[in-house]
Design a protein with these regions (language model features):
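PLP-dependent amino-acid enzyme catalytic core
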Residues: 2-321
Length: 321
């Protein structure tokens, strides 16, 4: 390649905004996990920590703001307010920082200190709510603040159709492209439900035989048993069925115990070199359960790994002697 062509190729890789770095995250085969558990399947992790603010939620943060700007609901002076357990807030904080908007995050006090500090590092204001009230308490506080602050806007990840839509437009097509259509099962945790809904919807549109499996905490089995409860798998298990979850998309729900999610997350770090979060551990544990079923022998399972484990070093998942 000539120097001129090299310069041209290099210029084409320079992005103008952090938001342009979102998406096109890699798939990696969890070969050691497969080997260590004697699994005759291919388990692929979609590693969302490669998004610029470190999680799958960067996708919806950008999408919700972009749609609100198009609709005239957000301008340069708009105060953004969002109830979040963490990752959506971090993604929004990065987008708001780049745009210059003020951002107020309401979140349960039970979320990790890393999540709080990350949002503050991006310049967001964090308002903590009663942990016993879960996400419902954070949502109520966000609505209260929106009523008090003029020119404010709540992206509302739990009700905003841009949430599942961006996964149908990006996450699903990326998986289909990178597997060359060779995907049999999708495994995704349910927080807002946007990932499993949008991604699952796209994959099923390409092949109706693709099985979609939703993952929730065993401590709060809202989808599988109809009741909420306390759990430690941050990012999934909001305690209610969100508007952004289409329950007709998934074929099965697997409930995962806190310790199983912790243990699998630790295993991914120690054996695969993948430092991912608690909900990633839950998704891979569920994938492992599916892999043990005789009918799934030889199949390809894609598990969404939503974020990085660096957000949870202070939690029970990484308590070292």
């Amino acid at each position: 390649m000539s120097n001129g062509n090299l310069r041209k190729a290099r210029i084409m890789t320079i992005h103008k905004s952090v938001s342009e770095l979102i998406g096109n995250t890699p798939l990696v085969e969890l070969t050691n996990f497969e080997k260590n558990h004697n699994l005759d399947v291919t388990i692929l992790g979609k590693v969302e920590l490669f998004n610029p603010a470190g999680s799958v939620k960067d996708r919806i943060a950008k999408a919700m703001i972009d749609e609100a700007v198009k609709a005239g609901k957000v301008n340069d002076d708009t105060v953004l307010i969002e109830p979040t357990s963490g990752n959506t807030g971090i993604g929004l904080a990065a987008i708001a920082a780049a745009r210059g908007n003020r951002l107020i995050i309401t979140m349960p006090e039970t979320m990790s200190i890393e999540r709080r500090n990350l949002m503050k590092a991006y310049g967001a204001e964090v308002v903590l709510t009663d942990g016993s009230k879960g996400m419902k308490g954070a949502i109520a506080k966000a609505q209260e603040l929106a009523g008090e602050i003029s020119n404010s806007f709540i992206p509302s990840q739990f009700t905003n159709p841009a949430n599942p839509s961006i996964h149908e437009a990006t996450t699903g097509p990326e998986i289909w492209r990178d597997t060359e259509g060779k995907v049999d099962i999708l495994v995704a945790g349910v927080g807002t439900g946007g990932t499993v809904t949008g991604t699952g919807r796209y994959l099923k549109s390409q092949n109706s035989d693709v099985k979609v499996v939703a993952v929730e905490p065993a401590g709060s089995p809202v989808l599988s048993e109809g009741h909420a409860g306390a759990h430690k798998i941050q990012g999934i298990g909001a305690g209610f069925v969100p508007d952004t979850l289409d329950t007709s998309v998934y074929d099965e729900v697997i409930a995962v115990a806190d310790e199983d999610a912790f243990e699998t997350g630790r295993e991914l770090a120690a054996k695969e070199g993948l430092l991912v979060g608690i909900s990633s551990g839950a998704a891979v544990w569920a994938a492992g359960q599916l892999a043990q079923r005789p009918e799934n022998k030889g199949k390809t399972i894609v598990a969404i790994l939503p974020d990085t484990g660096e957000r949870y070093l202070s939690t029970a998942m990484f308590k070292f002697e």
